[in-house]
Amino acid sequence: MSDDTTQIEPAMAQETSPRANTRKVFVKTYGCQMNVYDSQRMADSLAAEGYVATDTPDDADLVLLNTCHIREKASEKLYSALGRLRKMKDARAADGKELTIGVAGCVAQAEGQEILRRAPNVDLVIGPQTYHRLPNALARVRGGEKVVETDYAIEDKFEHLPAPRREETRKRGVSAFLTVQEGCDKFCTFCVVPYTRGSEVSRSVKQIVAEAERLADSGVRELTLLGQNVNAWHGEGEDGREWGLGELLFRLARIPGIARLRYTTSHPRDMDDSLIAAHRDLRQLMPYLHLPVQSGSDRILKAMNRRHKADEYLRLIERIRNVRPDMALSGDFIVGFPGETDQDFEDTMQLVRDVNYAQAYSFKYSPRPGTPGADLDDHVEEAVKDERLQRLQALLSAQQYAFQDSMIGRKMDVLLEKPGREAGQMVGRSPWLLPVIIDDNKDRVGDIIHVKIVSTGTNSLIAQKLA
């Protein structure tokens, strides 16, 4: 799952008849797809309380920043944003008006009270496992409290969240995220997720199917299942047997209206036979897999506590491509992990050449407080990290462009997601996740049409519709 602090304002319902006491909320999302999903579920909770969305903080009564803690810059972005909001809140106060500021997500979980100390203008801090308590927390804020809501028991937050209204789901489009698993038990030495999201927890089949059916009923055609280690999902199936993600995908594929399935993010250790069989047999499962490896060096993989070797990863890729030859691979890489030598880095470059990625995310290592990696010695100099990252990204970019060029002349089905920038233009999604731009003024959002790729754009494909 990419954690490159993509910033998204999630769609929320707009009321059709404004009320005098309507409260407006602005939600900003930093980070991964799961944060986007969490923002949408918080939006559902707030909609049930009478909040309506605004696309700017300028006229909001409540501003929520849903944060990411994977990398240091994400925290820096949060405090920079809070500094700007402080000025806005002070200006409101001078006019006798109020602005409530809330911090949600993984930085909220990791820093808790520290956020209130560093940014006293914040009214509410709420973690990713406690946002089902958001309406109650806001009521306490209106009563004059400063609220930090990060302690959670073994309880199912999804049982406490209202189902999204059909009209709200429609506004979000024909592709949707659905969280099926949260937390992580792998404890990679560079990663904060086990400390901010907790242990691995799988949602029940009943919950997942019910939410997927609601989404399909609202016009969703493509579902992306989310989890920190999504392929670690397991649970009792409808037949009484223990299911893994493969069996769950087969069940979701039976839901009328769901034409496409994806999942992210996976761990190599949890790619089992049933999941590989799903890639072989399930036509709705798209041929695109995000499977992070982080390094091509066995020595660094061991230091990272990744629990697999580079050759095991490569053999797994071979197994997957044997059953799905058109599979496109995406990955994550960290350069400059403590102790990484020139040879370790060259091993990573060789693995990248061996796999030939369609897309990948790469970052310089930055120590995260509280992780074992932060206590390691032999840190790599920043200049060396920079040079290695440039070399790696150049190779990955070349592979990505080559993958896009390989699409030219191919025929494929494309799911139309939205109108394009130009009149009569539509933007869809290829099976390999790339946006596809088509001159088409007859088909509608949600249609799946057959096209031929004629050229490439910037991270996109240009297509002609086929009869």
Swiss-Prot record:
Q: So what does this thing catalyse?
A: N(6)-dimethylallyladenosine(37) in tRNA + (sulfur carrier)-SH + AH2 + 2 S-adenosyl-L-methionine = 2-methylsulfanyl-N(6)-dimethylallyladenosine(37) in tRNA + (sulfur carrier)-H + 5'-deoxyadenosine + L-methionine + A + S-adenosyl-L-homocysteine + 2 H(+)
Into which EC class is this enzyme placed? Answer: transferase
Q: Which InterPro entries match?
A: Elp3/MiaA/NifB-like_rSAM, Methylthiotransferase, Methylthiotransferase_CS, Methylthiotransferase_N, Methylthiotransferase_N_sf, MiaB_methiolase, rSAM, rSAM_horseshoe
EC code(s) of this entry: 2.8.4.3
Which residues belong to any copy of the MTTase N-terminal domain? 23-143
Write down the species. Answer: Brucella canis (strain ATCC 23365 / NCTC 10854 / RM-666)
Positions that bind [4Fe-4S] cluster 2: C184, C188, C191
Indicate what this protein is called per its UniProt record: tRNA-2-methylthio-N(6)-dimethylallyladenosine synthase
* High-level lineage: Bacteria, Pseudomonadati, Pseudomonadota, Alphaproteobacteria, Hyphomicrobiales
Family matches, as PANTHER family: CDK5 REGULATORY SUBUNIT-ASSOCIATED PROTEIN 1, MITOCHONDRIAL TRNA METHYLTHIOTRANSFERASE CDK5RAP1
